[in-house]
């Protein structure tokens, strides 16, 4: 009885405090924006959260991922192509939009571009009268999806690729897509550029200056003048960035910043993009691209290898839930349809997410907070389900506690946190705690570091049953601005599924190697099995940059020369926070 009474008193006290501050401070200014901040179109883009990729073209029929550029256009002949089937499937799977590969690296165009004969206009599809870009654009309008285009800068078909003349051809393609197919929400530029190709029959390897050849500033100017609402994707943005992998996840630490001018399409330090640049001066949030199958294009032998709904759910939590967006690819099959296995798994994935995050246990509750700015920026804004209202601290306060008390103990295993990103990304570290049966606060055991929040942070943890939960912001770049908090019970199977997924995945932190030159050290983290870092001596120091939660250590021996540099015995030690004391890990 005493416990129940104290909880009620706590709840009433928090309500009273909020009411007094709201009445007494009606002209409080919002916190000043903390640079860099997003453009409004970048905020709207991130609110989409999940959207689809469609890879479809000659590669679908020649069983390749990267076509050489010499497959005849006549090979393209989908018998039952139905863009409305694509749109219906994507809506049922919770996708908010779709990006179509209008032209992949092989140079084949899915629309009748007048500048080439290598397009649907010279294929059997609809007797050369088809236009898949238009068909999908119209299907999107009918079913309420946003539409976007992928256009490969690299073209293995064009004879003049690598010359200034090719740029005129490429710019004309881009202008055609931007002016004739309605509004697009994104334009996608691939980082794969230059290499071997057909090139009009030359059959040779061509290299380009990936940073300067395409004159991206001119391209961006064209895009902004024709489709100002569109977000531009490339390795370095400027609208949104590649996340640095094609496995669909961002780092648990993920800043929406990059250092301006440093990252470009084909950037050779792509591992940085998984985490962003904490010292960046340009807002470029991460897009996490992944295919529902092993390949980006359809291959019949992969029908049994489609990602399960549970695997897709895991990717959602590690992309959207790690301050990114999820771009999920659907390889359209040779009939011109999204395969039924892909469709069923994607729809079930969406249903699971809806089920797990259906009921917010703190909706409408006003938490007790250790600091409050007042005016409109009060604690009640954290649970009012309004994106544009937010709680904020006073200017000098960069740490705070947010405490929820429940009338009785509840089971919980999911949490949602959101910062109000129009004013910038701020939080650098936080913890989550629950109140045990004795009234003491205990840490919620999480499988990942709790550093950044950004647009959205989703946390999964083994169920706790408690009458109180607390979020403690322990470090930030400036005064805090949070607009939503959610706490959920994902159901009885949540713990089992969560544990199974955790056992099957691995996520690496960025690191530097002491005593190893930069070129050799890069080989240790580039995820390329063909490169190897060799170390002189028998001591290797791995610097993680800051204190981290580490659950395992993995290394891959040299794959080129199996007998070179193999480790037969080793000891692993870790340094304390002050880096003065080292202890062996047993």
Segments from the language model and where they lie:
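Extended extracellular/luminal ectodomain segments enriched in beta-structured repeat modules
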Residues: 398-399, 407-414, 466, 545-552
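A short beta-strand element within beta-rich, extracytoplasmic domains
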Residues: 410-422, 471, 549-560
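Noncatalytic modules at the cell exterior or secretory-pathway interfaces
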Residues: 462-474
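C-terminal motif of bacterial Sec signal peptides marking the signal peptidase cleavage site
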Residues: 21-22
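Predominantly extracellular/luminal regions of secreted and cell-surface proteins
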Residues: 359-384, 495-525
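Short coil-to-beta strand junction motifs in C2/discoidin
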Residues: 423-431, 562-571
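Bacterial N-terminal signal peptides that target proteins for export
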Residues: 2-11
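Mature catalytic domains of secreted/periplasmic carbohydrate-active enzymes
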Residues: 26-398, 403-404, 416-425, 434, ...
């Amino acid at each position: 009885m005493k416990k129940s009474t104290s909880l009620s008193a706590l709840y009433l006290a928090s309500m009273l405090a909020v009411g007094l501050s709201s009445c007494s401070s009606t002209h409080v200014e919002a916190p000043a924006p903390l640079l860099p901040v997003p453009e409004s179109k970048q905020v709207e883009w991130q609110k989409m959260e999940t959207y689809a990729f469609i890879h479809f073209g000659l590669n679908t029929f020649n069983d390749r991922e990267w076509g050489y550029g010499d497959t005849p256009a006549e090979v393209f002949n989908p018998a039952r192509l139905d863009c409305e089937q694509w749109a219906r499937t994507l809506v049922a799977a919770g996708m908010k939009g779709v990006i179509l590969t209008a032209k992949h690296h092989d140079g084949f165009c899915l629309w009748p571009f007048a500048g080439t004969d290598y397009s649907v206009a010279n294929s059997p599809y609809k007797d050369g009268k088809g236009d898949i870009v238009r068909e999908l654009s119209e299907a999107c309008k009918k079913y309420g999806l946003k539409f976007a285009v992928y256009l490969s800068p690299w073209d293995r078909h064009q004879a003049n690729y690598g010359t200034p003349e090719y740029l005129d051809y490429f710019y004309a393609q881009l202008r055609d897509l931007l002016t004739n197919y309605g509004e697009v929400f994104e334009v996608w530029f691939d980082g794969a550029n230059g290499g071997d190709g057909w090139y009009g029959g030359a059959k040779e390897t061509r290299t380009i200056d990936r940073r300067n050849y395409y004159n991206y500033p001119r391209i961006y100017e064209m895009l902004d003048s024709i489709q100002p609402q569109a977000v531009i994707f490339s390795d370095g943005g400027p609208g949104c960035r590649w996340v640095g992998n094609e496995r669909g996840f961002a780092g648990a630490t993920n800043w929406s910043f990059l250092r301006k001018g440093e990252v470009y399409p084909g950037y050779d330090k792509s591992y940085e993009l998984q985490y962003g640049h904490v010292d960046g001066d340009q807002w470029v949030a991460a897009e996490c691209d992944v295919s529902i199958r092993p390949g980006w294009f359809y291959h019949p032998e992969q029908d049994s290898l489609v990602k399960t709904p549970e695997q897709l759910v895991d990717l959602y939590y590690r992309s959207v839930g790690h301050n990114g967006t999820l771009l999920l690819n659907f390889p359209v099959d040779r009939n011109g349809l999204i395969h039924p296995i892909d469709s069923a798994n994607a729809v079930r994935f969406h249903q699971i997410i809806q089920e797990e995050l259906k009921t917010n246990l703190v909706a409408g509750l006003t938490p007790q907070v250790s600091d409050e700015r007042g005016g409109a920026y009060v604690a009640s804004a954290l649970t009012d389900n309004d994106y544009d209202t937010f709680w904020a601290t006073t200017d000098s306060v960069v740490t705070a506690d947010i405490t929820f008390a429940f009338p009785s103990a509840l089971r919980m295993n999911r949490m949602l946190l959101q910062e109000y990103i129009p004013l910038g990304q701020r939080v650098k570290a936080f913890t989550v705690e629950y109140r045990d049966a004795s009234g003491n606060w205990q840490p919620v055991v999480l499988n990942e570091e709790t550093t950044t929040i950004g647009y959205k942070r989703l946390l999964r943890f083994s169920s706790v049953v408690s009458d109180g939960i607390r979020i403690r912001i322990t470090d930030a770049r400036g005064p805090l601005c949070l607009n939503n908090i959610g706490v959920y019970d994902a159901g009885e199977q949540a713990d089992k599924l969560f544990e199974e997924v955790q056992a099957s995945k691995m996520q690496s932190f960025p690191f530097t190697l002491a005593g190893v030159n930069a070129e050799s050290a890069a080989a240790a983290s580039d995820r390329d099995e063909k490169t190897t870092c060799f170390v002189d001596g028998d001591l290797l120091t791995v610097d993680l940059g800051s204190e981290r939660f580490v659950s395992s250590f993995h290394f891959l021996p040299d794959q080129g020369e199996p007998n070179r540099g193999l480790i037969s015995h080793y000891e692993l030690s870790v340094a304390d926070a002050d880096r003065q004391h080292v202890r062996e890990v047993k």
